[in-house]
Amino acid sequence: MSQILFKTKTFWYGIALTFCIATLSYFLAKLPFLMILGQLVTAILIGIIIRALFPVPEKWFTGIQFSNKVILRAGIILLGFRLNLVDIYHAGWRVFLIAALCLSFGITIVYFLAKLFGVDKKLAILVACGTGICGAAAVVAISPQVKADNNQTAVAATIIALLGTIFTVIYTLIYPILPLGPDGYGIFAGATLHEIAHVIAAADPGGSSAVDMAVIVKLTRVALLVPVCFVVAKMVNAGTKNRFSWAELPVPWFIFGFLATSAINSFGIIPTSVTDFLVICAYFLIAMSMGGLGLNVHLPSFGKMGGKPFAAALIGSVFLSAFGLALVLLFHLAG
């Protein structure tokens, strides 16, 4: 099946579209009024604008989804070549505690608000987990655990994609006035934003140290996807005849690739000139996935899905941002 997919022209058209968006965003981000947003956020916005103004053929989305998932993970793995694991050791337990607390708070507050607004239980769980863990990837992973249908999954993923984009733009704009240094800002972004791509894009204005911290905190949340899936499945199946299957638990294997490249860089095995080039490639691949993320935001669909789940996720995300900022300041990690 995958061999047939790779041979289709429409698949490559989707890849080519995200490639063009990444290239365009690279040059546009050099303009004064877009420089504050950076290449990655610019790529998301270009994708949203293209989807809103032009009819993107449905068959192209096989390639676009490939950019969203596979190319994004490849970019994250390559991004490890600029990370030094010694820095992670120095970050200490407080960083990982913040990640776990924000995950728990995000899921709880969004689910509570969604139920308060009368949102269907399955959709409420999907939106809550998407907000608290790792965006659309969490939505897709949790969906079979709660037996959600395709429409519920699509609605939740779209809500998270749009909200994550909105908050990414807001973060980049307010960064200069936040009481946070690069590392603190990276922890804040990694602990509170939705998708991995959103985290990298938002942290980028803070520089390399901000991005490194943001990725580590975010990957900590991603790693917690498996135990969260386990808990959700147990809760949903409680009192039913449905049996839990370990085989259905999603394992984010790309995290190990990221740690491997980080270890290689930490030991200085590869020359700096080579790792610098690989990091440039990583950013371009991530920009391609950003473009794909923007292309998946279908604005008219929000009129059909109703505002309740969106409102719950929006308000919950605001609370999550405030909670994450408070934790960073409380643990004296603002610098």
Swiss-Prot record:
Membrane topology (UniProt): Multi-pass membrane protein
This protein's record includes keyword Cell membrane: yes
InterPro entries in UniProt: Na+/solute_symporter_sf, UPF0324_pro
GO cellular component, one term: plasma membrane
Subcellular location: Cell membrane
Domain of life of the source: Bacteria
Keywords for the protein's UniProt record, in alphabetical order: Cell membrane, Membrane, Transmembrane, Transmembrane helix
Cell membrane as UniProt keyword: yes
Gene3D superfamilies: 1.20.1530.20
TM spans (from-to): 10-28, 33-55, 91-113, 123-142, 155-177, 251-270, 277-299, 309-331
Family the UniProt entry places it in: Belongs to the UPF0324 family.
PANTHER family: INNER MEMBRANE PROTEIN YEIH-RELATED, UPF0324 INNER MEMBRANE PROTEIN YEIH
The name this protein goes by in its record: UPF0324 membrane protein LMOf2365_2179
